Amino acid sequence: MPRFAANLSMMFTEVPFIERFAAARKAGFDAVEFLFPYNYSTLQIQKQLEQNHLTLALFNTAPGDINAGEWGLSALPGREHEAHADIDLALEYALALNCEQVHVMAGVVPAGEDAERYRAVFIDNIRYAADRFAPHGKRILVEALSPGVKPHYLFSSQYQALAIVEEVARDNVFIQLDTFHAQKVDGNLTHLIRDYAGKYAHVQIAGLPDRHEPDDGEINYPWLFRLFDEVGYQGWIGCEYKPRGLTEEGLGWFDAWR
């Protein structure tokens, strides 16, 4: 049976972030995820998780300077010290909040730059992250982002992400399989889910093409949910979508699992 985590960066935005934990619990979720926790102390977030009996399924390393177009530092040559500091900070939060995994953001490759150089830096930094997290039994995730959402991100295909995981060669590094991005770039989700089971440790969902609720658009999510059960996937499925209207009003798709 699939287990769903509400994405608090995109859902329940009708209320301030710190109030979204209670909203997610009231809606029937057992877990949450979000992009970045760093504007809040670990104690503030821990209090919300404990009060609402929620598991934290996932968060990301810091993005860098979003206003300057950055979306992660771990692939950027010459920024290794900052990337390591972001990874170390993420580990502090993961330990304090009992989160089993963190998505390490790669970054954007500027036009005209050598993508292979950026990829080599990312490989080294993912190994650093994996080695920092491994003694604590925690996982590192990498995620492919489709060009329409994040142009010039280091990698857009699930197969590029898989190749990175293979080259990193650490037992605690996995794919973060976002079916919205995967369908846009690669398609053939059945093949990805079946043939690469065990390579992904977190899943995210959204309707295509508008990234709304998973009952909207071209992806047959009831089929995919059965498929995840079939292959024995035990991880969380993060609901990283933009509600069409009020979050609660769009949760009809979730009724069977509340």
From Swiss-Prot:
This is 2-oxo-tetronate isomerase. Catalyzes the isomerization of 2-oxo-tetronate to 3-oxo-tetronate. Signal peptide: none annotated. Keywords: Carbohydrate metabolism, Isomerase, Magnesium, Metal-binding. Its EC number is 5.3.1.35. Mg(2+) binds at E143, D178, Q204, E240. GO terms for molecular function: hydroxypyruvate isomerase activity; metal ion binding. It catalyses: 2-dehydro-L-erythronate = 3-dehydro-L-erythronate; 2-dehydro-D-erythronate = 3-dehydro-D-erythronate. GO terms for biological process: glyoxylate metabolic process. Belongs to the hyi family. OtnI subfamily. The active site is at E143, E240. It holds the Pfam family AP_endonuc_2. The lineage of its organism: Bacteria, Pseudomonadati, Pseudomonadota, Gammaproteobacteria, Enterobacterales.
